[in-house]
């Protein structure tokens, strides 16, 4: 069990270590901890026994272990403080006109990368919860066409496909009509269910040639299940992550899944310190925070960095960006709901 004084010592060691990246000795703690040097050394030894501190090879000082950072994250972080001195710079970064949701998310990721020196990922609303608000088919050539989806009036997804053999022009019109009548206004999850339950019977009723039509439905809608993800500062991973982690970030859909699984449905914010047993994010820290996307749901901002982060500072920065981002998104969707349209 960690005593209150030991927790204060651990917090102070982490605070000093994240700024200096040097082992911390008992003398460096005496000004802030109202105890003798011997008492502090005993407490440091006890923290080491509990696996929260570890000895440095070249110094008599101690530094936090991964378990120590995990304990700090769980027991000492303040998730409600704002870094007032950085509010102006963050607000200033968003003081521009945006024409696409992805551009707003990218600005958020770029800003947090510049502030933190880490890798940042921004996720849109979970794909299964987005609604299909518009659909069209554009014929590209004799054998190819493009399905164009609009989700939540703000995200465009396209899927190119081969027109089935023996498909007539009127069959493409039927396909378009069925999708517009049956799917518009429904969530992607509802559409997935309808393709498996309702569409097979409808195909039999409306199409003379039914070969591969159900496969065509599944093909053109597959893209809608992909996460809308933006990333910034991937190259920063080379400063603190192993090659496997860097290569993992070449798979954005897997990255999105990893981030979502690290944040429970009832959590708005979480700090996860991954140990060496978690191969894809081994010895990395992930600070993830949900933000409101007005009229649509919530997205996620995630900072990925080394274990020895200045967690409190980064939490402050994420909180400020979240609030400013939500205000900007409110203006953006108010604009979309007027007589204006997003430029794609």
Curated annotation (Swiss-Prot):
Gene that produces this protein: hrcA
The protein, known as: Heat-inducible transcription repressor HrcA
GO molecular function terms attached to this record: DNA binding
Source lineage: Bacteria, Bacillati, Bacillota, Bacilli, Lactobacillales
GO BP of this protein: negative regulation of DNA-templated transcription
Species this protein is from: Streptococcus pneumoniae (strain 70585)
NCBIfam families: hrcA
InterPro entries: GAF-like_dom_sf, HrcA, HrcA_C, WH-like_DNA-bd_sf, WH_DNA-bd_sf, WHTH_HrcA_DNA-bd, WHTH_transcript_rep_HrcA_IDD
SUPFAM superfamilies listed in its UniProt record: GAF domain-like, Winged helix' DNA-binding domain
Annotated coiled-coil segments of the chain: none
